[in-house]
Amino acid sequence: LYLPNTYMPTDNGRELSERHMTRRDMGLPEDAFVFCCFNNNYKITSSEFDIWMRLLNKVEGSVLWLRQSNQWSELNIKKEAQRRKVDPERVVFAGSVPMAEHLARQRLADLFIDTFSFNAHTTAAEALWSGLPVVTKTGQGFAARVAGSLLNSVGLPELITKNEHDYE
């Protein structure tokens, strides 16, 4: 099987929940821009986190919606937001839900912002399947090029950046 633009086939049988979800249901503001990153928290480095906090400062009222991992990472992330002069309440965590609901709730976000050293893999495919655009920064190694591969394969190369300045 030859895959010219990506190494990772995905299946088109994943169902999105038909349950009506609102931003309020997810603890998100109804009228704000929602940046989202559902990658595992251990993929977040200070490089992208600094950019994300600058984005929150630039986009009035916006929030960052992250995957809930454990209480320690949540506390540390909120503490780091505050250290960067961002109200920690603007960082919202998404708890675990069944896959169909997880896929559907991504439609409540406006933009998926990727991590750098270890891009979203399946997470990017899920976001794209849900209709959520993904912005990534391509790197040198395999793990830092996966989201770009997926974006190329769906015809969205303009969402692939080559440096932090363009990503921001």
Located regions from the model:
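Structural signal for short hydrophobic segments within the conserved structured cores
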Residues: 1, 92, 158-160
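Short hydrophobic-acidic sequence motifs that mark active-site Asp/Glu residues
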Residues: 2, 34, 112
